[in-house]
């Protein structure tokens, strides 16, 4: 696109040899920017971010020691990368919207930070490559040189200020017949006219002063005709070579409309003069003129600054003259010309010098005008809009305009800590560590990089002081101008004033003084909070952080206040330090050669060895000649002091020619301001020290208050009334210099005149306290002062089936589920109940309920009671006895006919405490039923009915809540087919049992009593010992117990046994009411990953009605019992940056005058973690009517709830708790109690934004949802490795595990592969692997299967094995777990496993995307116990990491193995995860991105610079 990247250097040679120099520059830029953006958006743990930050800061410090623009561009890219990571962190991790106030404050701070980041980017863009344009030579033929009009506009400035500018303009080194100097006097003062006549300058006035300075210039353009116009403000005196060094570019480039030069100020600005050490700091304007404008020139976006510039008449007239719509006519004029396609240029050489604003208040006024003007341009002629500008120019103008919006962001940064210290609002929700590793590197990189770029033009931290001095004044201007851009007028900045005495300017600093007082109060509040108040760790950290923030803000504000300490200014003509060779001739003709120390329009100091005290009072002639500059000076002066080899002289100007010569000597020299940038390179620490030194200036003794003398007139003296000219348009043409006198002739006359100077008159030097300033002396500076410091019923037809043996059992309410304490009934919640379960193979013959508890003694006995019912049948009533509020034990017999399988025991409370009316929410309306109350049931067994159609009865009773046991009989041969079939049946029972505890004790013989399942080849299928005729299922009596039943799963071969098992589990509804049946095989559909029926689909929204019945989502009363929504998820759902999943919930509550919907609410919790509360208030009228037309949820109140991924597990439960309040219906008004509230079954859960991806090994995923084995519902990608001859304990553990799998997936394990340990070596297992057995049983297979585990089991001990390769380095990057895992100590693990169970997870040695989970231990019983722990909810939190040891009831978890991953992510998300877990890779990727971007940008900038300046000799270093 732009040709080759490089032309010189080592990089160029390398790229040329590899052919990469022909790659377009946009390629590395795009690649680098994309990589930087990706790296910038990756979130990592703060501790890891700390290492990344250390790396970037170290690199910055190393590279910053090397010079070169390529390094600078790279450091800019690196800085932007660090800042991008910071702002992304701020936006995604630190913002909490708890209330409207915190929201407003947090958003305001974020906007301020966004502004700061935008400003940083724009600054880098502007200053990336200053052009460093040099002067263009003029044609040798002077006849080709153009005519030039020089305009010096004035309004109310004093003549003494304007004289020097006009005389300097008249003395420009340019052909006299082509130089026209005009005074544009909007003040119409006769004195100015007379001076113009005397000096030979032109003089222009107009009839009406419209549009201020812009109008004045437009009028002058209308009455003059030169092709070029040069503009000087009335205090800007040019050097003689101004035109010779600038016009060349205007002639060489006919498309150039403007060439701007710097505004240099030879007098110190308020910051330099008023701050201690301020003179050692670059002037406030230096950065703009020394760096920004030069950068703008690179982009062809130089701003016109109103003075010291050459304008092409054709260009400015083509836009209708100078812009008059805003108060910054200069910048707006340049914008208009550039919209028309004109070019601009900037020559970074100070060719004129003027006066800076003397006082802070004047400086503020000037900046207020600039701010108003730039904001006006933004509103009225926004450069980001409209045609005519390239994008680079738009960005440059955006930078200039947006700069003056700094006031609100600056103030926001200063006062933000007050939000916490005074209002208690935490607007940055982050730990100090996180802030340190994100914010501090951002600030550090910005400061150091800007310091490198700005160098000697602007010192670090001083921009903050400059902005703070103006901020509070600019806030109002910023807002008003944004809203009303046409308001505001042009104000002339006063210059050249004097101060008789120093004083503190309250008018300029009082806003900051008030702000400092507020910050001091905040500091005291912070210290008080840290020292004397008691806080938790987080609160203490917040106090410390915000207090430090206040200290930083206070330092900046105090430094800005120090600027208001105005120092004495008694010189009308500031001194300029310069060393010039001069010759001083006294009255006796004695010539003394010397060098000046300083000069001014008032005098000079000359160092000469011949100075003697007797010269004081005498007159001398000072001669200075510079053939190079064409300056010849010979002006008389009076000796004021002569000592220590220094003569202090005051000019004794006799006429206009003398005055011109003095101006020429002081201002006309071509190198007069060459030292404008002679400041030491910026060093941030030194600069910070200067800030503290400046603050120390406030501690100096305050000077006496004094009237403010703004100019040289005496106190009480009124300005003289100036004679004005008539209001009319008038043009006085300038007199050519040749018609006045030539420069050579002037020099000759001067020499002759000096030869006639008489002897000096005897005169005493004035006393030191005399200023030497008089109204008559336009150069009135004596130059001698010292610079100042700055649960059915029995059917009779089946009664003969009942056994004679009765069993009695007593259950407390705790056993029935009241685990949280007594049942509490209240006026607004009068109903509580429990489930009483009677086993399906038993019938109740006698039942008794025994209750204890208490009733409120404040209730009326005749109107209060607790009614007890069982399945809506009356059982009894508890009466109130105010004298004895406690009751019990009270017993009630219950009719056995009331009982069914699942029974509802309910308690209904009716309470009143007064006879007229009652408040249901009164705290005295209560009753409590003790959780130690009990029910005693006597039951007998029913003769079993053996029919296959009743399966899974009698083996499984769905009403049972206690642990279920299903004995299994297996042959002792360890047949693999029988094992697979038994496992399939066990998983079917597990799927039916779901959350209930279930175990499968294994034996090789029929148990002595009870029921059992027998699986094997060629088993008897009837009492006569008949054999199967094929795959067969049969229910036969237990030969040892007539009440027991044995389910036989058999066939003639092992394959037929498996067919019988599949028929049992997949088509039990087709078996019919028979005791035995030969079955056929079942055809099964191919399963797909994550299609387990237990799992909520993640590819579509899921209705609540798909998970539970609608009745489960509704309740009665004002505070119904909590509603629950259980659901299962695959635990490997991964979202980008932990983005929450969404729940669209719709709730319904009775309308009308029943429930106070405004104060009623529904609380939503996830896995007992509170999420959010929502009002039951309906939507607005318009939304309500629109929903009736298009919404299926009409009448419901909708809410969207975020479900955080870190609160979601394999097994989950949403809880909804309604808390409604009745409407206040007045006294003695009945409040309806039979109300219903519900969660709409059409509410949805949406997990579509999740990807299946997980970090392994992770035993918590296995314990929660059998992951990763449950990924395939039929376990078709799972292999179970058992000992070759497993005992009953190991086989029982296997079946229990299959039951666990079935419960986890709700699908039988039809695809599982079972193999022996000895088969592993010949046939490596596929897929995910489960290993069951002791180390002795498994033999060498165990070590092979666990080859990638860091653990070794040997000699009844488990130890950490030898690490290999770079694994030790990997450990450095492991995360720190806070859930009780013993990270970092496992290297010394050497634990005995005697009488212990071991659960271990590792990566498969056969497939890096597969896992191995091993159940092992000292004995098979320990392994069985460990498997049973998977069904115990209380044990699940202890099962995590990659190793679990179970000793008795105690679990110990460890994590040692390196992390591996399973699943897949899109490429961009995989990279995000990878970089987020590998800080070194993140660091290197960031550097690569910054390097690529910097390489491309550097090459592009370099090429652009070559095109901007075609000749190498006309630009600086590229």
From Swiss-Prot:
Polar residues composition bias: residue spans: 768-785
Region (Catalytic subdomain A): 144-237
Transmembrane segments: 24-44, 71-91, 105-125, 404-424, 428-448, 465-485, 514-534, 543-563, 1481-1501
Region entry Disordered, spans: 765-785
Residues marked Important for substrate binding (site): 233, 235
Keywords in alphabetical order: Cell inner membrane, Cell membrane, Cellulose biosynthesis, Glycosyltransferase, Membrane, Transferase, Transmembrane, Transmembrane helix
CDD domains xref list: CESA_CelA_like
Region (Catalytic subdomain B): 314-374
Record's keyword annotation contains Glycosyltransferase: yes
A GO CC term assigned to this protein in UniProt: plasma membrane
UniProt subcellular location: Cell inner membrane
The name this protein goes by in its record: Putative cellulose synthase 3
Lineage: Bacteria, Pseudomonadati, Pseudomonadota, Alphaproteobacteria, Acetobacterales
